[in-house]
Amino acid sequence: MNNDQPLLKAQSPAGLAEEYIVRSIWNNHFPPGSDLPAERELAEKIGVTRTTLREVLQRLARDGWLNIQHGKPTKVNNIWETSGLNILEVLVRLDSTKLPSFISNILSARTNISAIYIQKAFKVEPQKSLEAFKDLDTLADTAEAYTNFDYDLFRKLAFASDNPVYGLILNSLKGLYTRVGLFYFANPSARELAKRFYLSLKTLCQTQQVNDVKECIRQYGKDSGVIWANMQAYLPANFNE
């Protein structure tokens, strides 16, 4: 196996094969639209059996990385056109140089999406929405507590909006959400800003000022974005592992 790039930390032959192929695609060693080498050649190059390789190829095809064509070479897809949120964790680990901007884009998307579904939740399920804030008064001043509360709050409000798709989106982001949250909420200023935001959001729900929800969320997105931008330089070296 002579891919110049270091591999992710594989724990099994299947993991090794998957990581080799994924990294080769990401580094344009196997560019979008190209054909993968024949199974026998690729299996020998990676050092796994053809059976193991075949299982890996099928899994990567399900995730959108590849297009398996029976009787034809396996073709590499453009993941930005064929994959879903399930590959985000992999992308974060693949390229540490793009990690800060990648996370910023995810946080921006979260702000824009949540501004829609939280307003809807407050309209259609005000009582259920209020229940999502029930642990706010006893929220411990720790990064872990804030990370868990923040994720649970946004997730509960997503399902309260009567559109479960928003909840499924958050489910797919949980691993990354937790990793970013534990780092971000280690900053006392981030926790203080978040607490004020939660209280403001709760008040808007109680008073049914639903037309002010989007602006409240977008302002929090801007303010928290400033804190995040200042923290990016201190991301630990192993953050994307």
UniProtKB/Swiss-Prot annotation:
Subcellular location: Cytoplasm
Entry-linked InterPro entries: FA-response_TF_FadR, FadR_C, TF_FadR/GntR_C, Tscrpt_reg_HTH_GntR, WH-like_DNA-bd_sf, WH_DNA-bd_sf
GO cellular component: cytoplasm
Pfam families reported for this sequence: FadR_C (PF07840), GntR (PF00392)
Keywords: Activator, Cytoplasm, DNA-binding, Fatty acid metabolism, Lipid metabolism, Repressor, Transcription, Transcription regulation
Highest taxon listed in the record's lineage: Bacteria
CDD domains (alphabetical): WHTH_GntR (cd07377)
Entry's Gene Ontology BP terms: fatty acid metabolic process; regulation of fatty acid metabolic process
PROSITE patterns recorded: HTH_GNTR
DNA-binding region location: 39-58
HTH gntR-type domain: residues covered: 11-79
Protein's UniProt keywords contain Protease: no
Main localization, broad class: cytoplasm
Annotated GO MF terms: DNA binding; DNA-binding transcription factor activity; fatty-acyl-CoA binding
Known role: Multifunctional regulator of fatty acid metabolism.
Subunit structure: Homodimer.
HAMAP family named among the record's database cross-references: HTH_FadR
Protein name: Fatty acid metabolism regulator protein
Species this chain originates from: Pasteurella multocida (strain Pm70)
Gene: fadR
